[in-house]
A protein has these predicted regions:
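Glycan-recognition and catalytic cores of secretory/periplasmic carbohydrate-active enzymes
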Residues: 1-402
């Protein structure tokens, strides 16, 4: 986002009559963050989980279709975002499957409706469009790879073949975009080659056992991509070509760093290949140490792991999820447990402390902290809340991850 667009968001934000109170509440949170974290009440994490789920359901039911949108304080709701709708579905079904949560039934219903909508908007080529629906973009590899996560969750939950068939079409289209060197070199976001394709490969590997005839070929293609990604990793575990912009690719955001590391770790587990897990754990531990030492992460990190820009809670939640996986895989990874628990408290504080109680905003996690940071400025991106509730369910041992 350029300086002009950034200043325009500030102006639009303050034109709303009640946004001064949001601003001062946020400033108060920044000033007294240490105290908020220290005195976060018992039961607050579970409250944050329930309220986050309620907001995700609202993000689906408030619009004209049954996709999930993003809310901006300065401009309201966007059109639906197929990619994030896809990976919100597993979160809703995981919450619903115990039947214990106050919004369990509504979560299940919203997940089914979102899944049916995604089936309707799947392209003839097998992919799904990038970006928000009003942008009318072509099919995109990364976005399609996230929607097959939702298709898998629905298939496991219902056993209905329509979700499996949809995923197969999508996966075949994704592999058509992989070149001989292992890069997704066509039909990906910005037309740029990026390493966070690991987060596309991982759900394909999770699907592979359900497609016995394709399994070996898919695993070979997955290894081709993952091996290329490892060529982009430095000795200090930092990853080149990891940002979702062109002009800041030298200092990627923790959101896309976490995508890449999580994809590597899951792929390593599914393929039983240690080198991918080691690559993921290395980067995850660097960021865990920085977080524990400082109490907060920067939003971006350059090749020396020097940070800049405001904290991006989405990336924090994603890292907490990865730290949880690492801790579950290795009981000696005490650093991962400490970082995960501290991050989940921080996310709960950010999401619940302050003036946001209205239905469009209550319970949601913001794009940046403070909310006027450069990432999703004054926004409540649905993917931030999705990852927060996933991480809180891990922390609370809510149910097994699907």
């Amino acid at each position: 986002m350029g300086a002009l667009a950034y200043s325009q968001r500030w102006a639009a934000f303050f034109k709303k009559y009640d946004h001064w109170r949001y601003f001062f509440a946020e400033w108060n949170k920044v000033v007294y963050l240490k105290s908020y974290r220290k005195h976060h009440p018992v039961g607050a994490l579970e409250k944050s989980l329930h309220h986050g789920i309620r907001w995700l359901i609202h993000s689906i039911t408030q619009g004209p279709d049954r996709g999930s949108g993003t809310y901006y304080h300065h401009s309201g709701w966007t059109s639906s975002y197929p990619e994030t709708t896809g990976y919100i579905i597993p979160s809703l079904l995981r919450y619903a499957q115990t039947g214990d949560g106050p919004w369990a039934e509504s979560a299940e219903s919203a997940a089914f409706e979102a899944g049916n909508w995604l089936l309707e908007v799947q392209r003839n080529d097998g992919g799904w469009p990038g970006g928000y629906m009003h942008q009318h973009r072509d099919s995109v590899v990364f976005n399609t790879g996230q929607i097959i996560r939702g298709m898998r969750a629905l298939y496991l939950y219902t056993g209905e073949e329509v979700y499996k068939q949809s995923a197969h079409r999508a996966i075949e289209w994704i592999w058509d975009q992989l070149d001989a060197e292992g890069k997704f070199s066509s039909n990906d976001f910005m037309g740029a080659v990026r390493v966070y394709g690991t987060y596309v490969v991982a759900p394909i590997l999770a699907w592979a056992p359900h497609f016995e005839a394709d399994k070996d070929v898919w695993e070979a293609k997955a290894r081709l991509h993952l091996d290329w990604v490892l060529t982009q990793q430095q000795e200090n575990f930092w990853l080149a070509n990891c940002d979702n912009t062109l002009h800041k690719n030298h200092k990627p955001i923790i959101h896309t760093i976490a995508y890449t590391l999580d994809g590597l770790f899951d792929a390593g587990c599914l393929l039983k290949e240690a080198k991918y897990k080691i690559a993921a754990i290395g980067g995850a531990e660097v960021l865990a140490q920085k977080f524990v030492e400082r109490g907060l992460l920067h939003g971006r990190y350059d090749k020396q792991w020097c940070g800049s820009e405001a904290f991006i809670p989405t990336g924090g939640a994603q890292l907490a999820i990865l730290w949880n996986k690492i801790a579950a895989d290795d009981s000696h990874s005490f650093w991962a447990v400490e970082a995960r628990s501290s991050m989940n408290t921080l996310l709960s504080v950010i999401a619940t402390s302050g003036a946001r109680t209205a239905r469009d905003v209550g319970g949601a996690l913001q794009g940046s902290f403070p909310m006027w940071g450069r990432y999703e400025t004054f926004g409540l991106p649905n993917w931030a809340t999705k990852y927060m509730v996933d991480s809180l369910m891990n922390e609370l041992n809510w149910s097994d991850e699907r």
